[in-house]
């Protein structure tokens, strides 16, 4: 779950790693306990609001998912601790990859069941073999789950993620994400330093793939408008082509170009999806439009020979 979906910019606590993890785990545990204790109140209230507003009981569905998600997070933390205690070196990495894919799959399946989602996937086999650069559309708070569920778990592909640091607020993402080769970008930090971090991430990529969100942030019509205005004010030669992109933001080239430069001769795999737009923020979810949505996912591969050298 992405805490920025609440409409707030939630930064990881400014403290040492151990202290940060204690804080976030305590927040998750307290939130889950509070939801459980108050369930005799919010369950009937959610039913009454659903009957009154006629929005497919979306508030009740979201509260049920939130209660599950927080409780499942705590259970997963116990399993993560077990992996760290029982496994060593390569065996630990393999176990964490399996646990990561399982965690994502369970979360997505529960969301799918509670919200009545229909998910159709086409071309997932194009993600293998690695190595490759996975370029995924960013439109919802569930986007980080999709590659784990539809690429990593069924095909055994190890994926290295480029994610924003705000996701470290999630204890499972923090612990597993930092134990495996991934990079958490400080979007307010030193850009050259962040790009150097991407180069280090893929310096020994082997048969793994690396995933990045070229847009840099979740899509919205307002963000697209601002991005186009910025390109126009800068007199960018990309302005016309950016206007043709109606359902994605103009890509931020720095990260992708850095990966292409660091990984010459490697294919790119595009991971497109539609139907999750109502998952962008909590206020979008509360509209009820998400219930019964059809989610379409399509992957296609572009050979390195088709990618311009300049």
Regions from the PLM with identified roles:
Residues 153, 165-180, 204-309:
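A cross-family acyltransferase "interaction/gating" segment
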């Amino acid at each position: 779950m992405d805490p920025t979906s609440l409409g707030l910019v939630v930064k990881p606590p400014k403290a040492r790693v151990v202290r940060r993890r204690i804080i976030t785990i305590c927040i998750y545990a307290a939130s889950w306990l509070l939801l459980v204790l108050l369930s005799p109140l919010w369950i009937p209230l959610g039913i009454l609001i659903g009957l009154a507003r006629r929005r497919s009981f979306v508030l009740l569905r979201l509260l049920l998912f939130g209660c599950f998600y927080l409780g499942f997070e705590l259970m997963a933390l116990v399993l993560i601790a077990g992996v760290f205690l029982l496994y060593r070196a390569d065996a630990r990495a393999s176990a964490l990859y399996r646990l990561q894919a399982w965690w994502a799959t369970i979360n997505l399946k529960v969301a799918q069941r509670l919200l009545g989602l229909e998910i159709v996937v086409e071309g997932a086999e194009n993600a293998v073999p690695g190595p490759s650069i996975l370029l995924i559309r960013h439109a919802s708070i569930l986007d980080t789950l999709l590659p784990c569920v539809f690429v990593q778990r069924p095909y055994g592909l190890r994926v290295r993620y480029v994610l924003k640091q705000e996701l470290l607020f999630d204890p499972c993402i923090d612990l597993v994400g930092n134990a495996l080769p991934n990079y958490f970008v400080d979007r307010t930090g030193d850009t050259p330093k962040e790009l150097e971090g991407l180069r280090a991430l893929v310096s020994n990529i082997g048969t793994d793939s690396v995933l990045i969100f070229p847009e840099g942030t979740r899509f919205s019509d307002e963000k697209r408008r601002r991005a186009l205005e910025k390109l126009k004010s800068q007199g960018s030669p990309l302005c016309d082509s950016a206007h043709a992109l109606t359902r994605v933001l103009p890509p931020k080239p720095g990260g992708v170009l850095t990966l292409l430069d660091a990984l010459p001769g490697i294919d790119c795999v595009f991971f497109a999806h539609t139907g999750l737009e109502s998952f962008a923020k909590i206020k979008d979810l509360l509209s009820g439009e998400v219930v019964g949505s059809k989610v379409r996912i399509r992957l296609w591969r572009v050979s390195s020979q088709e990618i311009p050298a300049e």
